[in-house]
Amino acid sequence: MPPTEQGATMNPRDGTDYLPISMLNQWAYCPRRFYYMYVLGEMEHNAPVLEGMLQHERVHAGGVESEGEARVHRRVYVWSDRLRIAGFADLVEVRGGVLLPVEYKHGRMGRWLNDHIQLCAQAMCLEERTGRPVPCGAVFYWGSRRRQVVELDAKLRARTEAAIVQARALAESGALPPPLTHRAKCRDCSLEPVCLPREVRRLREEAAGHGGAGGSCEPWRRST
């Protein structure tokens, strides 16, 4: 039985084990961010997040329309019973019987594996639902005003399936991952005020520098 639209946004602990496709993007970007958003339900809105939400609203308006030889379907709900994932594709273009999922992103074009994994997951859902091969997809980056065509090859598909397994395992583990050491990712993250990556890293370094004295009351006894 296919999941409901609501099921695509629910945590498995709330009664469904269909992982939201958008959360695969978060996991590939930063497992700690994924855990905060998906498991703990944390979400903060900074300027880039709000701009991205407004841009997606513009993309999703309109339903189905024709653009040249292509038929364009907006905000298409997709799912895979095999992979136990579900979510929305911003656009699905149909040209000559070939499907092209298109994802819209706020930032600038680059080799963003997290975006490619999300796109690949959408494509595999479309393949399962329609029985048609989806050889490639595209990501439109608002910051560059350009579309990046992504080949959905065997390597990317394997990475995507591995991401699904690892993201689900992390959600079920109940263990908050450590912060990244990638300063640029942390700087641009809306959850940085909640995650406190610098502070957490500093505390970990201080604890490690005391040779494993953690768990002992001796340092405080010596100070009295």
Locate predicted features:
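Metal-dependent nuclease catalytic cores that hydrolyze phosphodiester bonds in DNA/RNA
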Residues: 1-101, 217-224
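Local cysteine-cluster metal-coordination motifs and their immediate loop/turn environment
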Residues: 184-197
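Alpha-helix initiation and N-capping motif
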Residues: 21, 32-33, 157, 164, ...
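Nucleic-acid nuclease catalytic cores
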Residues: 79-87, 92-175, 191-193
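Short microdomains enriched in Cys/His and/or Lys/Arg
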Residues: 201-224
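Extracellular/mature segments of secreted proteins
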Residues: 38-39, 195-199, 203-206
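Immediate flanking context of iron-sulfur cluster ligation sites
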Residues: 21, 166-187
